[in-house]
Amino acid sequence: MPAGDQLVAVVNGQDIPLQMDVKTTYADGSVNNAILTVALPAIAANGAVNIMLATNSAPAAATPAVNAESILQQQSYDLSVNVNIHNADGTTTDYNVNAAQVVEQALQNGTAQSWLSGPLATEVLVTTNITSTLQATFDVRTMANGQVYTDVIFGYDNAYTVNNSNLTYDLDIQNNGQTVYSQTDMTQYQHTSWQTAVWSSGAAPTLNTVYDVPYMVSTGDIPAIDTSQQVSAADVEANYAALNASNTCPMGTALLTTYMGGTGQTD
């Protein structure tokens, strides 16, 4: 998108609120990659809405960004992480991280890393140490409608320390005093990270985005996919059933082949 232009979202001929956070640009200032946030109109159960994106050279009206600290206070944001580390000598060590407190302090002292900032959504990342090698990152998105989404990321990926081994721990993540995610005797391997999402409403939205593939091909945005080639519904159902029966927990291998000596194949 050319530098200086604005992006608008159109539904039934009417512009709807859109926020664009530009992440990378080309040398001439035009947009290469951006994250779009759209305020959708009400959609009936099992309904659908078509959204068209278009450019507009008119300057966007200045609107204040969502105040993350204010939204978190309004929603009484209360997220905590409890980790029980299994030590090599058979003992255990408990650690507790009050995510709400960690995020609030980072917002107040300016150390929170900004990812999105606009009138529809503000997103920040805050990282804290659980142990000397295990870190928790809270990727907190606050939205204008009051919703709060937190991506909790556990990183055991410090490559500059010695004598590390796999880490085994029990985990309990609580939102407003209620357990929303837990694991027992989970082993996290060296140099890995994993994540889980928590919504303030308790349940993730059930929206499903369907892209206009032929149009995207025509613009050169994606390679020329032959959409006449169909995938067997039976194959999709079989793979879905196999995935559900596999280990999809953190550090699980799901349907991946763990043997590295093969020549590789594509189904």
Q: Can you name each region flagged by the protein language model?
A:
Residues 118-119, 127-267:
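Catalytic cores of extracellular degradative/oxidative enzymes
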